[in-house]
């Protein structure tokens, strides 16, 4: 009995529609939806970047050894 009834919510909704109009409310709704969509997209991109960064890169020594062996193979084939 201290809560808001459905009738009170309905009266508040009617007052809001009368004050702002349906066009403005529709615009606010689409802006809010776009903001939520952009937020979700940014969160997904951040998670994918974390997944990409989880691997451990090869050390410089391993990369230089690999490059040296590849260049030797290229010279032998030529």
Swiss-Prot record:
Q: Which InterPro entries match?
A: TatA/B/E, TatA/E
Keyword DNA damage in annotation: no
Q: Where in the cell is it found?
A: Cell inner membrane
A Pfam family per the record: TatA_B_E
How this chain sits in the membrane, per its record, is: Single-pass membrane protein
Could you list the residue ranges that cross the membrane? 1-21
Q: Which GO terms describe its molecular function?
A: protein transmembrane transporter activity
Q: Where is the composition biased (Polar residues)?
A: 60-69
HAMAP family, alphabetically?
A: TatA_E (MF_00236)
This protein's name: Sec-independent protein translocase protein TatA
Query: What is the species of this protein?
Result: Vibrio vulnificus (strain CMCP6)
């Amino acid at each position: 009995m201290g809560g808001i009834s459905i009738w009170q919510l309905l009266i508040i909704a009617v007052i809001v529609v009368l004050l702002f109009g349906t066009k403005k409310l529709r615009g606010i709704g689409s802006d809010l939806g776009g903001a939520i969509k952009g937020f979700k997209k940014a969160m997904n991109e951040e998670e994918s970047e974390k997944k990409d960064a989880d691997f451990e890169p090869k050390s410089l020594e391993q990369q230089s050894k690999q490059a040296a062996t590849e260049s030797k193979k290229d010279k032998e084939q030529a």
